[in-house]
Structure formats: C-alpha cells, structure tokens
C-alpha cells in the first residue's frame, strides 16, 4: 500500500471513529464521562493526518502505521462491546508499593464501575519483546502494567468489591503472556497466538530476575511470535460476575423521600414554595418510589441512630398523618444501628457541603460496608473531591408536602405533563 493510500485510509478511519465515539457518548443517559476527551483526541489525530495530507507536515511512512489511532480505535471498540459503560480514559489515583502517589489511566470503565478495561492496539511481537526486556528504554511491559492495574484496583473498590480487570488485545497476544495475565487474575480478550521456541524447555524463555540485559539478544533468537498460529480467540466475558452488595444504609433524604406525599400521588399541586412545585413536577415526569423499591428489594436495610432521630424530628415538625404512618411502617423494616463513622470518613475536612451529620451517616454506611441511598449529591461530590469515594445510590429528593397541600393549588384533572412544555 502506498503512503498516500495509507494516509487516505487513516483519515477515513479517524472520521468514522469520531462518529462512533460521539454515538457512544449519546448512548447513555447523561453521557459517558471522558467521552468528550476521547472525541477531542480523535479530532486532534484527524487534524494531524489532514496536515500531512496537505503537505504541511512531513513524516515517515512507518510513522503513519504507529499513530495513536490504533489505540483510540481499540478504546472505541472495547466501549462498544461492553455493558453499562460509565467512563473512558478515566484517571485513578493510587499509592504504589513504595508508597509513592501514582495515577493510572483506565481506557474503559464498564459494568457500572465494576469492570476496568485496558485496550491494547500494539502487535503481539512488540509486546512480547518488551516483556523479554527487548523494548526501548522506559517501555513498561504489559505484565508490569497489569501489576499497576491490580495495585490501583485494590485501592478503588466499587460497592466494596475490587473492579474486575480485562486486558483487550486488538493485535493478538502471545500465549505465555496471556497465561501470565490469567495467573494474575486478569481476563484476556483477543487472539492468543503461539510462540515458536527453539529450546527443549520453553520455560527457559521467561527471564528470571537474576538474568541481565546482556542475555536479551539470546532470548530473542530463540523465540518467535507466530501470529498466523492462533491458539484461541477470546471474546469479552458476556457476564462478569459481580458480588452484589446486599446491605443498604438509608440517609435522612431517602427516609423523607420514601414517605413523602409527593411519592404517593400527591404531586398534582402548585405549592406556595417554588422548590416543592419543582419536585412535584419532577415526580410527575419520573416517579422516584419505584426506583427506591427496586434498589431496596431483597436487601438488608440499615440506618444509624442520628439519621433516624433527625428524621423523626423533621417528621414531628413537618409531616402529615399519611407521611407519619408510612414512616412508622418503614422504620420497622430497618435495622437501626449506633453511629459508627469509618476512619476515612472522619478524615474529611468540614466544609459547606460536609457537615458532621452527613459525615456520621455516610461514615456509618462505610463501616457497615453498605451502599448509602441518598439525594445529597453535594456531599458525595465534596467527599470525592477530598479523595473519599463512598458507595452510593443517588436519587432525586422529595420533601414532606402533605401538610402543605391545604394551601396549594390543585392542578386541573385534564392537566398532563405535556402541558408543562
């Protein structure tokens, strides 16, 4: 293939990938975090290729083959083949074995956060040679990168489970490397190809820690990745087993939402208070209670003493008879436990969004290894900004409104949600 036709092909691929990346971002309600970053990287690649085409930049033909496009294409294809993609090119912070702070880029975070994917576009030969110590200075082998992924994933539990790691190879992987990754607990996706060995004992091919760099060329002479000899083709796992957390911690905002008259049909009013009218409108568009019930189903419910005490106090002041009655039934379903905030929750610095009450409630959920249900997204974001990521289920808020209905204006019987637009 001539340099010009290769360039035209690369430009066509870049344009197609931009469309696919934009489509991916639209496929999830609220978009995919990092989707814009992926699109901008692809657009930068296209711009560069168009400059080459226009003769503004001169590059070698070999450089055309090794553009970032291969890796970006692998990311797009991975994201297209996975369920519940929440982010792409996500940067996670972690502490390495020496106690140094490091960052790790995860190409695709899928399965609601439970799966981390590294998409690899490099050829099996190059990857295998780097592993044998024959790469360029500073090249990190896939196995070393896998160790980083494991280290980081153990420090970033999702609902108290470590994310499952998949290394997705789009230009094959050698059989010994695939085996090593599997031993480490990492899933492999892609074509697994043979390594032709000229030794009687293939295990001698794997360099030990005591082997010096001088022995590298000898190793290279006795191993050859045979990409024609595909031993297995492994697709992405269709069902990744996730240990579903069966414990739920209820925040005050959730307790209120669960018993609110708004959640039980009392949303056809225009209230004196603007915020209540807005919540009623939200409820008419999207009911919250079915979402709460679905998440709470078959789970053990907890609430800390502070949350229940404050909830009762709010209920005594603002609650209507129906709301109080529902609260009595709800509290009977809940295990009320003493306040026991976790150590990492107590390390949070107080701010306008982080008060002692929220800290106690979320911290107790953390100690219980429970998912905290909440409408308090401000606290969750503020804690996240301080490096503390709580396991949460966030929903829309609903206030206690039953006692406000007497002064509210009922909506006409024929009023529909469409009338609001």
From Swiss-Prot:
Pfam families recorded: DUF1308, DUF5614
Cross-referenced InterPro entries: DUF1308, DUF5614
Q: Give the protein family.
A: Belongs to the UPF0415 family.
Its protein name is UPF0415 protein C7orf25
User: Species name for this entry?
Assistant: Homo sapiens
């Amino acid at each position: 293939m001539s340099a010009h036709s290769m360039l035209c092909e690369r430009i066509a691929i870049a344009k197609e990938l931009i469309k696919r990346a934009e489509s991916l971002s639209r496929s999830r309600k609220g978009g995919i975090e990092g989707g814009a970053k992926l699109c901008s990287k692809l657009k930068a690649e296209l711009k560069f290729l168009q400059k080459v085409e226009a003769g503004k930049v001169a590059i070698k033909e070999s450089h055309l083959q090794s553009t970032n496009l291969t890796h970006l294409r692998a990311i797009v294809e991975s994201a297209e083949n996975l369920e519940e993609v929440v982010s792409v090119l996500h940067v996670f912070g972690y502490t390495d074995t020496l106690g140094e702070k490091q960052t790790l880029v995860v190409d695709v975070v899928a399965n609601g956060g439970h799966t981390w994917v590294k998409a690899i576009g490099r050829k099996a030969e190059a990857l295998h040679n780097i592993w044998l110590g024959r790469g360029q200075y500073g090249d990190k082998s896939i196995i070393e990168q896998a160790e980083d992924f494991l280290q980081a994933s153990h420090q970033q539990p999702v609902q108290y489970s470590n994310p499952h790691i998949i290394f997705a190879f789009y230009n094959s992987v050698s059989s010994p490397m695939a085996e090593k990754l599997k031993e480490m607990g990492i899933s492999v996706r892609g074509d697994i190809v043979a390594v032709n060995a000229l030794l009687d004992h293939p295990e001698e091919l794997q360099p030990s820690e005591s082997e010096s760099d001088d022995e590298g060329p000898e190793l290279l002479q006795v191993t050859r990745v045979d990409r024609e000899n595909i031993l297995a083709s492994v697709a992405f796992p269709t069902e990744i087993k996730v240990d579903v957390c069966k414990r739920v911690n209820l925040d005050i905002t959730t307790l209120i939402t669960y018993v609110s008259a708004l959640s039980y049909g009392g949303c056809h009013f225009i209230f004196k208070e603007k915020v209540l009218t807005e919540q009623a409108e939200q409820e008419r568009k999207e009911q919250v209670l079915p979402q709460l019930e679905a998440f709470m189903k078959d789970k053990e419910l907890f609430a800390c003493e502070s949350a229940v005490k404050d909830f009762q106090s709010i209920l005594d002041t603002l609650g209507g008879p129906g709301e109080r009655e529902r609260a009595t039934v709800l509290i009977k379903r809940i295990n009320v436990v003493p306040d026991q905030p976790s150590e990492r929750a107590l390390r949070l610095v107080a701010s306008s969004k982080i008060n002692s009450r929220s800290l106690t409630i979320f911290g107790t959920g953390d100690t219980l290894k429970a998912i905290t249900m909440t409408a308090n997204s401000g606290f969750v974001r503020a804690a996240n900004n301080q490096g503390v990521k709580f396991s949460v289920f966030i929903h829309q808020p609903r206030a206690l409104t039953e006692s406000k209905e007497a002064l509210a204006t009922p909506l006409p019987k024929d009023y529909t949600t469409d009338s609001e637009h």
